[in-house]
Amino acid sequence: MLPTVRKAFRERGKLRKTIAGHCVQEQLEGVAIVQDQGKPLGASMGQCTTLGRFTERSFTYVPAATLSLKQIQLLLGITAIWGMNWPVMKYAVTQYPPLHFRTLCMLFGMVAMWFVARQMKVSLKVPREMWGRLALLCIPNMIGWHLFCILAVKELSSGRAAILGYTMPVWAVLSGLAFAHPVSRRGWIGLTLAMVAAMLLLSSEFAAIAGSPLGVILMLIAAACWGFGTTLIRHYPTGLHALTFTHAMMPPTIVAMGLAGFWFEGTDVGAPQGWSQWWPIFYNAFGVFAFCQVAWFSLAKSLPPVVSSLSIMIIPVVGVMSGSLFLGEVPHWPDFVALVLILGAMAVILVPGRRSK
């Protein structure tokens, strides 16, 4: 069993420190890495297991990560609220300028987070030494994603935007190259499927009389920002509570989105008028930012990538179905084919394959 343990740690973990070949500290990815009498062994994402000598007596077995009831509830909530938010955003940007809409969503969302933090007795104070790291994480995870996403939603149907947005896991795999993580064969297969889907939708937009190829490109850029940002979160942990972590990135994002709104949409945009313009803002402020954004970062830091990312596979399906139900959007055959390809890409990348015994 001992060589299997060493091999598993080399393949599935990130070697932190080795002293004379005896003392090893590993940060595991949180999947089942060893089989011992049919029982999977592993460790949760971000948990460090310090081993003594590589002997069966001193080896510490840590149970593989499992989902608690609370985590299951968070995943279901994220799936429903984020999935239905695609038609909500599409409706909102037809009623109000998109960049101003997103800025107001985040502004009210930050206030909602403050109240949630008070109720949970979570400190929102960020140590000074973390400011630079948070600024780095904020650029792709918040500014890049929200800026390009909301501009793309204005150009595309909500279902098509959702399909393209959830190419994120593919971009997360590619972004691993920046950290010298080679792309596996499954990663390249997933990338190929996602690119075929993107090209199919792009060609469909070119062929349509009122199509918007720019919308496809903007949504792919947004997804790439999200994927790269998710990778950065795992490589540059802050140790902050998920609520503190998310809240701290809101002010610079609000400033960036506000400036972009003034630049592209002008300064004479009035306040939202009527319930038709206000309710999407409240939905995003409380549902997306105060709940989904915090829950996502919490799961991204506490669960393995495989577990936390599997939850997003159903979101584009919810987006397509809810867009058809609430907005009367009619998906065409390129949308269905692209959806299948994207789901296939996510499955190839996120679902662990069988390993030889």
Functional labels for PLM-detected ranges:
Residues I81, N85-W86, W114-G165, A198-L200, ...:
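Specific transmembrane alpha-helical segments of multi-pass solute transporters/efflux pumps
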Residues R6-K7, R12, I19-V24, D36-T103, ...:
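Glycine-/small-residue-enriched transmembrane alpha-helix faces in small-molecule transporters
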Residues E129-L136, V183-M195, V216, L240-M249:
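Cytoplasmic-side transmembrane-helix entry/capping segments in multi-pass membrane proteins
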Residues G83, L107-V111, M195, I254-V255, ...:
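Small-residue-rich packing faces within the transmembrane alpha-helices of Major Facilitator Superfamily
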Residues T79-G83, L137-H146, M168-P169, L202, ...:
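Transmembrane alpha-helical core positions of polytopic small-molecule transporters
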Residues L67-Q71, Q95-T103, V126-G132, W188, ...:
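Juxtamembrane helix-entry segments on the extracytoplasmic side of multipass membrane proteins
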Residues R102-L104, M142, H146, R160-T167, ...:
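Helix-helix packing/entry segments at the starts of transmembrane helices
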Residues M113, T167, V183-E205, M313, ...:
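Hydrophobic transmembrane alpha-helices of multi-pass small-molecule transport proteins
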